Regions:
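Partner-binding and oligomerization surfaces adjacent to conserved cores of proteins
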Residues: 2-331
Length: 331
């Protein structure tokens, strides 16, 4: 799957900033918004998290072990809705749906480990926020007692890319929560990528042709759609999470290829949380100068919290400013 992702939008990291809008996009077809290099990005964490990150690494959790149980599935569900909307032949729709579901199961099964080929891959997610002093985020991630780290997006992404290696790929973008927007993005991408010229198919040149198209063409069409689903699945979430204002970085890593561990591959490790083994990777942060501010949680009222953090940064010669949350909570 890593190869499929990589080949589908290989020019992602070369996209240029657009001065006339807040966001650029992954590329001309995958319309996931991206920040511009001078923008800020925020990460809510604990004191231990700050120590680890400023020590030079993020612990990045495997996507299937995140808090949202529907991670990496929303794009697939919406794609099925789109197919159902355009296909009047119920038997042909069920055929296409079954093909898509099987293809997606195959992709994500191979992410764990393919026992035949001996390959293993994984998708790992760091969640950031576009809001730097969010009441919801303080509550959800630190019980109002943690810290919010402010990064320069461009520098942060650059240092991650420098440490990705040949067997990992970084994708990043703003999470999309609105169902109508998700549907429009996915439908538009399918139409522009797969239906604009129809050169790949003998009998499919538009949505109306799906009901009568040859099965071979339907299968090829669904195979192509599945790659689009893989990409959008990374950045689609349910609307109930919209207040998180998430911006995420997704690392696609090959841990093993045909029973061989690639040189410089990133190993999987495991931490224990609530008696559960959680797979993660250590992603190196070579240049900590991308960290500009740390905000102390709104209920962390001890003056020692600010003093201790400033003392810590000073001892490590880090030019990071410390400030208190402006949210006036008492208890």
């Amino acid at each position: 799957m890593h190869k499929i992702y990589h080949n589908s939008i290989a020019a992602e990291h070369k996209s240029e900033e657009h001065n006339m809008s807040k966001y650029k996009h992954i590329d001309d077809f995958i319309k996931i918004p991206q920040l511009n290099n001078k923008d800020q990005l925020f990460h809510y964490t604990s004191a231990a998290g700050i120590k680890g990150i400023t020590g030079g690494e993020f612990w990045v959790t495997e996507s299937r072990f995140l808090n949202d149980s529907t991670e990496f599935t929303i794009g697939t569900d919406i794609c099925i809705e789109i197919l159902e909307k355009h296909m009047r032949n119920s038997r042909r729709f069920l055929y296409a749906k079954d093909l898509l579901m099987e293809q997606m199961r195959k992709y994500y099964r191979e992410e764990q480990e393919d026992t035949v080929s001996g390959s293993a891959e994984g998708s790992y997610v760091i969640s950031f926020c576009t809001s730097g002093d969010s009441l919801l985020m303080w509550s959800e991630y630190s019980d109002f007692m943690g810290y919010c780290m402010e990064f320069k997006y461009g520098k942060l992404k650059e240092t991650f890319q420098e440490h990705c290696g040949n067997d990992s790929t970084l994708f990043d973008g703003k999470v999309i929560y609105d169902h109508d927007e998700q549907t429009e993005l996915l439908e538009d991408t399918i139409e522009r990528l797969l239906l604009s010229d129809g050169e790949d198919y003998k009998t499919i040149h538009g949505w109306d042709d799906l009901d009568s198209a040859e099965e071979e063409d339907v299968k090829l069409f669904v195979d192509h759609i599945s790659v689009i689903c893989l990409l959008y699945n990374m950045f689609f979430k349910k609307e109930c999470f919209a207040q998180e204002q998430e911006y995420r970085m997704v690392f696609l890593c090959v841990h093993k290829r045909e029973h061989q561990v690639p040189e410089n591959s990133i190993p999987v490790e495991y931490r224990i949380k609530d008696e559960v083994f959680i797979p993660f990777i250590r992603m190196k942060l070579g240049d900590i100068s991308c960290l500009k501010f740390v905000c102390v949680g709104t209920k962390n009222i001890s003056d020692l919290a600010v003093k201790g953090l400033r003392h810590y940064f000073g001892s490590r010669n880090l030019e990071v400013r410390v400030k208190k949350s402006e949210i006036p909570l008492r208890y």
